């Protein structure tokens, strides 16, 4: 099993989990196709992490891309950056800029 992570990505975890659902339990080539047609920002980020995990597998263990399968996709919430927007009469309302930690684990297919 080979793992790749991306941390502190400026994508809301709730939206990133939607994109992660597209690639669960697929082969690596199918998952890359699914993510390349996704219009979500999280899809682009997950595709980069998936490519990194595949590169780790090819570099460290000489595993062929065709034999790899997406074993686990995890989207965890990162820190929340708090900003404020000015409102009328001296008030303010909070703006929460959420971040995500993306983890993709790939491995060889079960026979």
Curated annotation (Swiss-Prot):
One term under GO cellular component: cytosolic large ribosomal subunit
Keyword Ribosomal protein belongs to the record: yes
Keywords from the UniProt entry: Ribonucleoprotein, Ribosomal protein, RNA-binding, rRNA-binding
Annotated InterPro entries: Ribosomal_uL22, Ribosomal_uL22_bac/chlpt-type, Ribosomal_uL22_bac/org-type, Ribosomal_uL22_sf
Swiss-Prot/TrEMBL GO biological process terms: translation
GO molecular-function term, one example from the UniProt record: structural constituent of ribosome
Family annotation (Pfam families): Ribosomal_L22
HAMAP family in the cross-refs: Ribosomal_uL22_B
Similarity comment text for this entry: Belongs to the universal ribosomal protein uL22 family.
Role according to the record: This protein binds specifically to 23S rRNA; its binding is stimulated by other ribosomal proteins, e.g. L4, L17, and L20. It is important during the early stages of 50S assembly. It makes multiple contacts with different domains of the 23S rRNA in the assembled 50S subunit and ribosome.
Self-association state and partner proteins as the record states: Part of the 50S ribosomal subunit.
Official protein name in the record: Large ribosomal subunit protein uL22
Classification lineage: Bacteria, Pseudomonadati, Chlamydiota, Chlamydiia, Chlamydiales
The gene coding this protein: rplV
């Amino acid at each position: 099993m080979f793992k790749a992570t991306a941390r502190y990505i400026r994508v809301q975890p709730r939206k990133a989990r939607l994109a992660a659902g597209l690639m669960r339990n697929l082969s690596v080539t199918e998952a890359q196709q699914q993510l390349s047609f996704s219009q979500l920002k999280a899809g682009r980020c997950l595709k980069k992490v998936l490519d990194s995990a595949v590169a780790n597998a090819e570099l460290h263990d000489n595993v062929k891309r065709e034999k790899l399968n997406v074993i686990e996709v995890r989207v965890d919430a990162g820190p929340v950056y708090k900003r404020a927007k000015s409102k009328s009469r001296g008030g303010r309302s909070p703006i929460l800029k959420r971040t995500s930690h993306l983890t993709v684990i790939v491995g060889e297919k079960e026979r």
